[in-house]
Amino acid sequence: MRCPFCAHDDSQVKDSRPAEDNAAIRRRRQCSKCGARFTTFERVQLRDVTVVKSDDKREAFDRSKLEQSVTLACRKRGVTQEQIDQLVSGIQRQVETAGEGEIASTRIGEMVMDGLRQIDSVAYIRFASVYRDFSEARDFEEFASTVQEAAKD
């Protein structure tokens, strides 16, 4: 594995352990040239999946983009990185095991909302505000009231 610090092509694995609920392997590596230590994650990729956007553009499924969106929604909310990793890994597994080469971005958005609803209601509303394109304060109020009603049931 190439060192991110000096770009040398050789590194040794110093520690290896399961991560993300056994969906990945976390490896601590050390560069044999500069001695820098860094962490890598190894994940199974079942198939290449294309995401179909609302404007009909297509792009490869990008786990890091999904993780970035979830992390942004959960910022300053007390949601652990482990919870975020589990949610993202679960969504990635659903996307890859769906048996289709393409998936609508709206379907992924619904998966994220379902997961966030169970983790943190504020993160859920934050994500929904972007995903559903809230344009006024009234949109937030209406959505928040539906979340509160659902919580009572």
Curated annotation (Swiss-Prot):
> In this protein, which residues make up the domain named ATP-cone?
49-139
Q: Give the record's keywords alphabetically.
A: ATP-binding, DNA-binding, Metal-binding, Nucleotide-binding, Repressor, Transcription, Transcription regulation, Zinc, Zinc-finger
What does the record say about how the cofactor binds?
Answer: Binds 1 zinc ion.
Instruction: Identify a single GO molecular function assigned to this protein.
Output: DNA binding
Cystine connections: none
Zinc finger boundaries on the chain: unnamed: 3-34
| Top-level lineage group | Bacteria
Coiled-coil ranges per UniProt? none
Q: Does the keyword Metal-binding apply?
A: yes
**What cofactor(s) does the depicted protein rely on?**
Zn(2+)
Residues passing through the membrane, by range: none
GO terms under biological process: negative regulation of DNA-templated transcription
Q: Name one Pfam family in it.
A: ATP-cone
Q: Which NCBIfam families match?
A: transcriptional regulator NrdR
Q: Which family does it belong to?
A: Belongs to the NrdR family.
Q: What does this protein do?
A: Negatively regulates transcription of bacterial ribonucleotide reductase nrd genes and operons by binding to NrdR-boxes.
Give the protein's recorded name. Answer: Transcriptional repressor NrdR
Q: Which organism is it from?
A: Erythrobacter litoralis (strain HTCC2594)
